[in-house]
């Protein structure tokens, strides 16, 4: 199995060969010396084929760039979320959804599942398992909220023992 760096090297070698060929084709289209009959060999169809190939190449590179940017943004958001949870002393949820809400057959987004109401007591009910007190979740949407105090996130009520903590992301 080849390493990632070897694969990237092979990709750039192939790209170099492709750009060399593109340079040769461009020189045939626009010869330096007027005496060269190579420019006359190109038909409109061939020129259009070359134009389409170069456009597809650019479009494919743009698509790859978008995929990488989206993945990078998702990784950054996940890292920030994990850091916020760690800094606030809240355990990270065991199951974090990989995708947004699922689409139903009608094409309408299904509402997120309703969370059970928080219990104000950690005393177990008769015959049932002990019920833990629910903690408020700090979500990325709350962190990214552009309403009042967007630079400060108040995480009151996350723990009963320590006083309320404030996160300020503008500090260096």
Swiss-Prot record:
Query: Could you name the domain of life of the organism this protein comes from?
Result: Eukaryota
> Is Phosphoprotein tagged as a keyword?
yes
Q: Which residue ranges have biased composition labelled Low complexity?
A: 120-130
| GO BP terms, alphabetized | chromatin organization
Alphabetical GO CC annotations of the entry are: cytosol; MLL1 complex; nucleoplasm; NURF complex
Any idea which GO molecular function terms this record carries?
A: DNA binding; identical protein binding
- Protein's job: Component of chromatin complexes such as the MLL1/MLL and NURF complexes.
Q: Under what name is this protein listed?
A: BPTF-associated chromatin complex component 1
């Amino acid at each position: 199995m080849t390493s990632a760096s070897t694969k990237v090297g092979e990709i750039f070698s192939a790209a170099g060969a492709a750009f060399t060929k593109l340079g040769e084709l461009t020189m045939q289209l626009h010869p330096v010396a007027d005496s060269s009959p190579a420019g006359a060999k190109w038909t409109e169809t061939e020129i259009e084929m070359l134009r389409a190939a170069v456009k597809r190449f650019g479009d494919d590179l743009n698509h790859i760039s978008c995929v990488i940017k989206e993945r990078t943004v998702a990784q950054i958001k996940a890292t920030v979320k994990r850091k916020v949870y760690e800094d606030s002393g809240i355990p990270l949820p065991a199951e974090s959804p990989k995708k947004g809400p699922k689409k139903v057959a009608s094409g309408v987004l299904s509402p997120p599942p309703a969370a059970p109401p928080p219990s104000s007591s950690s005393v177990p009910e008769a015959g049932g398992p002990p019920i833990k007190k629910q903690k408020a979740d700090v979500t990325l949407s709350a962190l990214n909220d552009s309403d009042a105090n967007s630079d400060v996130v108040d995480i009151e009520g996350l723990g009963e023992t320590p006083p309320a903590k404030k996160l300020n992301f503008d500090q260096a």
